[in-house]
Amino acid sequence: MLLFRATLLPSPPFFHKTYFSHLSPVIFSDDPLPVSLQRNRVSGCRKQKWRQIRTLALQSDTLSEVRSAPPELNVERNKFRILIAGGGIGGLVLALAAKKKGFDALVFEKDMSAIRGEGQYRGPIQIQSNALAALEAIDSQVAEEVMGTGCITGDRINGLVDGVSGTWYIKFDTFTPAAERGLPVTRVISRMSLQQILARAVGDDAILSDSKIVDFVDYGNKVAVILENGQQYEGDLLVGADGIWSKVREILFGYSEPSYSGYTCYTGIADFVPPDIDTVGYRVFLGHKQYFVSSDVGAGKMQWYAFHNEPPSGSDVPNGKKEILLKIFNGWCDNVIDLINATEEELILRRDIYDRIPIFTWGKGRVTLLGDSVHAMQPNMGQGGCMAIEDSYQLAHELEKARKESIQSRKPMDVKSALKRYEKERRLRVAVIYGMARMAAIMASTYRPYLGVGLGPLSFLTKYKIPHPGRTSGRLVIKYAMPLMLSWVLGGNSSKLEGRSLTCRLSDKASDQLRKWFEDDDALERALGGEWYLFPLNNGDIQPIRLVRDDKRFHIIGSISHDDSEGISIHLPFPQVHKTHARIACKDNIFYLTDLQSQYGTWITDNEGRRYQAPPNVPVRFRSSYSIEFGSDKKVVFKVKVLSTSHKSAVYGGQNLSPVV
């Protein structure tokens, strides 16, 4: 059998795969090598055999290196080397942190596309204030590039809304906790862009592509990894940052299945700009056994995630994901439906959601775990990647501390104690945030706006629109608990970060109206951008009507033209419409409808499904997503919609959306 072994030095060029030609093959017997080399799996005699093989390999390599290797390869390695399984965010940030501390790092990544193109599959990632601060403490220049590339969402309104009505349930203030503690404001960045930035900072010479770790041996003073192709690399520490299906974790503690959350997730990116893009960063739309998340990711794009309760390993018919989603979220608010409609079918992806309950012990000997390999979380808190970044900072910090102690005491570096301190510092915080993510998933998917929702035979109660007691009490609890929770999640780790000044960027400054938007829904609605339209629901002969947002002008609706009046005439030649039926006017960015004592009346259905008649000569406010009926037989019905100027045609198939003037 052929065994390839390379002794790699700190000199950067020799991490690169193009130098594999210097590796010397050593021919042994035809007996296969052990599949697993960890101590708890290999019998005594197989261990002895492996040590003999390794001794022969070392002797042969030494002769080979003397004869054929460049002079640099004969220099003794004197830097502490960290072997990192996995080139995801956690692995790359750890490699960067190690590099900044003066350690060697070598990242093993089985598929370079996981670094260069993972974002195409998994979409943008939210990097919250706590992770950005940790990244600043690791490398301020890299953090600056990440923040400059990302899209700020923490300077706007974020929170929970009712999935059907689209009304706010609770708003999150992620700006104040960051500003008060001198932390960067939360961003969203393309996962691919983030990993490219990190990979450049780490250097291609420290990333070994096409390399999959299948086994390792901890010798007490060193650790060696064995790749799928038989190559072996030696270091002082092995860190498993290889994700929820971690091979390093499996070898350490045995195979175990991750926990299925009960939800599958559809995700997509749309060229779509909502009309409230300047005031809202992200929303979580709540429903029963399903929920929907949307977020601005910059560059005129929106990222969304649709969670639905169903068994794992499901599948969809070819090109059928959008159709399935429209059925699942049928009857939900326009914010959800419009975003699904605006997404191309081929950009919709599906994956099941799993997590791993954090374990008490993260490693053994000179091997430890980091990120999803030890505490994979559900995505509801947006903290999965953030925790991996915090892990990376803490691990590098503890290793640097151990090195300083070693120099002072003139004793070998106590790696095992450093790893124990790393676990101790991270264990509680990770467990609490993991629990919060699970609770958020439960709350988002068990939300019931009204009595009768999810009650089977008693579902008829929903038509009475009686608020569910859990909805009311839940809002009260969240209102007072959320500020404390966000303060701890976003700022609770900042006191442990060394070498970082407590500063806020001018570019992170929020609108002066932010506090008012949190407290006043009307003020938030008045700040809504875009254009207002009446879209016909059951008559294809009528074009959408754009309403003029001008306090000095108004619309007159009637079955005859009113071009000679002061108002803007909207001509609806139908028997249900009176000659002078109604007037629509705008005041302070709010629209009102007044029925002008029409013969058949004017009816309004709000976004919670309540239908009522507009009283004659009394201005009645209407909002986006309301329906307006001229006449009582539901034949002349319009849906009120607000669309961003640049993206309205993408959702409505290029219909003529010219104003009526």
Swiss-Prot record:
GO cellular component, as recorded: chloroplast; membrane
Give the reaction(s) catalysed: all-trans-zeaxanthin + 4 reduced [2Fe-2S]-[ferredoxin] + 2 O2 + 4 H(+) = all-trans-violaxanthin + 4 oxidized [2Fe-2S]-[ferredoxin] + 2 H2O
Q: What else is known?
A: High expression of beta-hydroxylase (BHY) and zeaxanthin epoxidase (ZEP) results in the accumulation of violaxanthin, 9-cis-violaxanthin and neoxanthin in the yellow cultivar Gower Ramsey, while the down-regulation of BHY and ZEP results in the accumulation of beta-carotene and orange coloration in floral tissues of the cultivar Sunkist.
Segment annotated as transit peptide: 1-59
Under the heading CDD domains, the entry gives:
FHA_ZEP-like
Instruction: Give an example GO molecular function.
Output: FAD binding
> Which annotated residues bind FAD?
81-109, 359-372
Matches recorded under PANTHER family: PTHR46496, ZEAXANTHIN EPOXIDASE, CHLOROPLASTIC
Query: Cofactor(s) for this protein?
Result: FAD
| E.C. code | 1.14.15.21
Its subcellular locations are: Plastid, Chloroplast
Principal localization reads plastid
The enzyme's main class, written as a single word, is: oxidoreductase
* Tissue and organ expression note: Expressed in flower buds, lips and leaves. Detected in roots.
- Keywords associated with the record: Abscisic acid biosynthesis, Chloroplast, FAD, Flavoprotein, Oxidoreductase, Plastid, Transit peptide
Q: Provide the FHA domain boundaries.
A: 555-609
List the InterPro entries. FAD-bd (IPR002938), FAD/NAD-bd_sf (IPR036188), FHA_dom (IPR000253), SMAD_FHA_dom_sf (IPR008984), Zeaxanthin_epoxidase (IPR017079)
Protein's name in the database: Zeaxanthin epoxidase, chloroplastic
Q: Which GO terms describe its biological process?
A: abscisic acid biosynthetic process
Q: Does the keyword Oxidoreductase apply?
A: yes
